[in-house]
């Protein structure tokens, strides 16, 4: 049991540091890729997984085996000829038009704007361009929303020279039409759409993106030369709707994966403090003006 991401993935965090994998829970953060590669933590984590044990940071994949990101990483690694490749992901910036209930201002400028002036604007683009571009074979973009970011627009116009696969995470509030041209250049493009509910559940969790806009744009992506899949972050807000989401994905022939939310703890399905949960939800509704 081993995950190739331990050798090849670099994730940008909102504070400009790097971590190993975007699906890890509370991984250590490092100032540079070089510092992470030479860390005792990485040596110990690789040894642990090579011994058939799950590192604490990898609990999200452990809970969703055999349909975990680890399985996807194994396939991707097997199909990659360049052995010193990098898979780069994480937060390039936090410019986003949505204020999803499970998100925060470090991943969404829309949430920050609701709290008043002085909210953080994240920009890791300089750090990205310092990476060895020729080693970047897989690009895994998420957080904020690519359509609303000038940094992502620049990136899509200046992709690394050896890039083979491109994955973007989107709230599906609009369509990235430029992906057609990129796919036609022979780059495998995957669009991962965050789907945290059907109908009214979606409208609450993914506020303020309307379900009808989400659905229309999702159907447009189905007509494009891209691999399309759905991703669900399961929380107390949508756990009861998970079967409906899975049914929706099956009916439309779209691959679907999910993992359980760990933070904020108030919205975790493992949280037993109902008073804290209800207070958190009420505060978020008030912030967004939801009656």
For each predicted feature, which ranges?
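Accessory C-terminal segments flanking Radical SAM cores
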Residues: 1-75, 262-291
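Recognition helices and adjacent regulatory flanks at domain boundaries
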Residues: 52-86, 96-98, 117-119, 123
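Detector for the c-type heme attachment site
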Residues: 62-64, 103-109
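Core AdoMet radical
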Residues: 85-95, 106-123, 134-149, 161-177, ...
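Leucine-rich repeat
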Residues: 127-133, 155-160, 181-184
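Generic structural signal for well-ordered alpha-helices
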Residues: 156, 179-180, 215-219, 242-246
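Acidic (Asp/Glu)-rich catalytic clusters
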Residues: 181-188, 222, 250
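Catalytic cores of alpha/beta
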Residues: 236-252
């Amino acid at each position: 049991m081993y995950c190739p991401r331990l050798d090849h993935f670099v994730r940008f965090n909102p504070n400009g540091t790097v971590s190993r994998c975007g699906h890890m829970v509370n991984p250590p953060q490092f100032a540079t890729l070089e510092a992470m590669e030479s860390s005792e933590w990485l040596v110990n984590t690789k040894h642990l997984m090579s011994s058939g044990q799950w590192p604490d940071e990898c609990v999200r994949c452990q809970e969703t085996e055999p349909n975990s990101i680890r399985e996807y990483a194994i396939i991707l690694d097997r199909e990659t000829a360049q052995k010193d490749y990098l898979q780069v992901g994480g937060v390039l910036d936090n410019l986003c038009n949505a204020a999803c209930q499970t998100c925060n201002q470090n991943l969404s400028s829309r949430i920050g704007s609701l709290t008043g002036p002085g909210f953080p604007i994240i920009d890791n683009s300089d750090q990205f361009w310092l990476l060895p571009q020729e080693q970047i074979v897989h690009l895994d973009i998420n957080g904020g929303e690519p359509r609303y970011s000038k940094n992502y627009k620049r990136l899509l116009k200046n992709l690394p020279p050896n890039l083979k696969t491109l994955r973007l995470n989107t709230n599906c509030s609009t369509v990235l039409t430029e992906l057609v041209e990129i796919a036609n250049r022979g780059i495998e493009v995957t669009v991962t759409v965050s789907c945290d509910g059907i109908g009214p559940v979606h409208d609450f969790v993914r506020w303020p993106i309307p379900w009808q806009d989400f659905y229309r744009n999702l159907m447009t992506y189905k007509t494009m030369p891209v691999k399309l899949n759905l991703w669900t972050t399961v929380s107390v807000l949508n756990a009861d709707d998970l079967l409906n989401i899975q049914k929706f994905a099956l009916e439309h022939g779209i691959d679907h994966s999910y993992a359980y939310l760990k933070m904020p703890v108030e919205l975790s399905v493992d949280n037993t403090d109902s008073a804290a949960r209800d207070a958190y939800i009420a505060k978020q509704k008030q912030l967004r003006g939801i009656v």
